[in-house]
């Protein structure tokens, strides 16, 4: 990887977008669409990292983007049929599609990405709970709230630890530039 596409830069962009997304979704609870869009950027950064880490012999073929696009379009159609297609919901579907792809991709990358795979899997469980919270009865909201944070906090800790380990491995020392 070149300096322009170093894992350190990719992870820093993802972490900044995560903090900004958390700010809009959790702290202020305003601009929810922007917050979800920022998490789409996070997943895009992780997808870029996975692409750059792929062996040159095993770079994704055209079938991989086709599968992701097909899943995304299918979920959009489901939203349309349910009369729930909004920009916010479309971004949420994009986010969960990207996250699901990244999660499955990391599990296939071997032991060196295990920590990242576990972090993304917990992140996926968190997002599933967020989705369930929006459709479950009000009485279940507190349980979903607890589950969301029970999955989310460990996911972010594992992802940050993994990113720091990558920065040390690739640079010899931890530097942000």
Predicted regions and their residues:
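Polytopic alpha-helical membrane-helix bundles and their juxtamembrane interface segments
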Residues: 1-177
């Amino acid at each position: 990887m070149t300096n322009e596409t170093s894992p350190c830069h990719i992870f820093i962009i993802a972490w900044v977008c995560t903090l900004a997304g958390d700010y809009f979704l959790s702290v202020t609870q305003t601009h929810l669409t922007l917050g979800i869009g920022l998490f789409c950027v996070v997943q895009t950064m992780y997808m870029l990292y996975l692409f750059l880490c792929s062996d040159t012999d095993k770079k994704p073929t055209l079938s991989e983007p086709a599968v992701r696009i097909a899943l995304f379009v299918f979920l959009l159609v489901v939203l349309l049929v349910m009369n729930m297609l909004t920009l916010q919901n479309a971004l949420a579907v994009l986010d969960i599609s990207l996250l699901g792809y990244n999660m499955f991709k990391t599990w296939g990358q071997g032991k060196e990405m295990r920590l990242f795979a576990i972090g993304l899997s917990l992140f996926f469980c968190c997002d599933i709970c967020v989705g369930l919270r929006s459709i479950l009865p009000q009485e279940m909201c507190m349980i979903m709230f607890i589950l969301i944070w029970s999955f989310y906090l460990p996911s972010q800790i594992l992802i940050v630890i993994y990113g720091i380990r990558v920065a040390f491995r690739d640079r010899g020392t931890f530097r942000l530039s």
